[in-house]
Amino acid sequence: MTTLRVLLAVCCAAYCILAEDVTVPANGELKLMPDQKAGGRLEGQWKISTPDHYYLIVSCGLWSSASGTCKDKILITQGGKTTEVCGEGKNSFYVQQDTNLNTAEIIILTNTPDARAMCTVYSAEKPKEENTF
């Protein structure tokens, strides 16, 4: 049983990506660049937040020569909904904003050596609620 636990821990360490917690300052921006791994693969995972009374605008771009598959992808999770952005042999861009959400998680995983990916996350002040009398 102990050998199995050690083997499982080694496998998890080899294949799991640990998310980096980052905070976007109020009215600020943050560029997210994945780490380059062996064979040119890119990997990155971030848990992002901004202060209360602010929301996140997520903007990601991915280019990959791998067409017809989703070998290279960006996963963007906000408010319990995950969006998958695939390279598929072209430039793929994605912008998401929800004025109710001040957290997000982004995962970038590529298997094609020439793939390029990055995200920029902006913090914006939530709109003021108008009093309706």
Curated annotation (Swiss-Prot):
Membrane-traversing stretches: none
Domain of life of the organism encoding this protein: Eukaryota
Stated name of the protein: Triatox
Keywords (A to Z) from UniProt: Antimicrobial, Disulfide bond, Immunity, Innate immunity, Secreted, Signal
Source organism of the structure: Triatoma infestans (Assassin bug)
Function field: May function as an antimicrobial peptide and may be related to the innate defense of the insect in the salivary glands.
Tissue expression as described in the entry: Expressed by the venom gland.
Domain CUB: 23-125
